[in-house]
Regions:
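Alpha/beta catalytic barrel-like cores
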Residues: 1-127, 140, 149
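Helix-rich catalytic cores of soluble enzyme domains
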Residues: 115-170
Length: 170
């Protein structure tokens, strides 16, 4: 698929993007609230049932995955990305490494993850990802965001976008 075709499929009328990229720590909190042990098997069963739902075809255009999830094979046979594709959605992957304190500022952040991104994108493409998620956090307030924060995050976003398109992903 071309980048345009991927984007159109993800954003088809009536469809949305499912953010299923929770870390093992985040899903542990959710499981704890319903008394489910945070085991890889339980995480796989949860995700498999979610992505195997018949409503996927009608309402979901894309699914953002976490590193663990994109590598999992279902008990049904296909990998998680294949299961998502079989249900008409585009598999994607979270590729940033989180917002970290921005040097020289006590109230701002910069998103990390550009180091090694080209290699990670190739691996994620081979695993079935066709789009990516990267977030930049801007704190809004008195004299915030600073011009330096805006420029630094914009530069990181531009480098990220160029690498993603080079890898044939959205």
């Amino acid at each position: 698929m071309t980048l345009n075709e991927i984007a159109r499929k993800m954003c088809a009328k009536g469809k949305g993007i499912l953010a299923a990229d929770e870390s093992t720590g985040t899903i542990a909190k959710r499981f704890k609230s319903i008394n489910v042990e945070n085991l890889e098997e339980n995480r796989l069963n949860f995700r498999q049932s979610l992505f195997n739902a018949s409503a996927m075809k009608d309402y979901i255009g894309g699914v953002i995955l976490f590193d663990e999830t994109i590598r999992q094979k279902t008990t049904l046979g296909p990998t998680i990305p294949e299961l998502i594709s079989n249900h008409g959605a585009v598999p994607g992957i979270k590729v940033d490494k989180g917002a970290k304190p921005f040097a020289g500022s006590s109230n701002e952040t910069i998103t990390e993850g550009l180091d090694g991104l080209r290699e990670r994108l190739k691996e994620y493409y081979d695993l079935g990802a066709r789009f990516t998620k990267w977030r930049a956090v801007y704190n809004i307030g008195d004299k915030l965001p600073s011009l330096q924060s805006i420029k630094s995050n914009a530069h990181a976003l531009a480098r990220y976008a160029a690498l993603v398109q080079e890898a044939k992903m959205v």
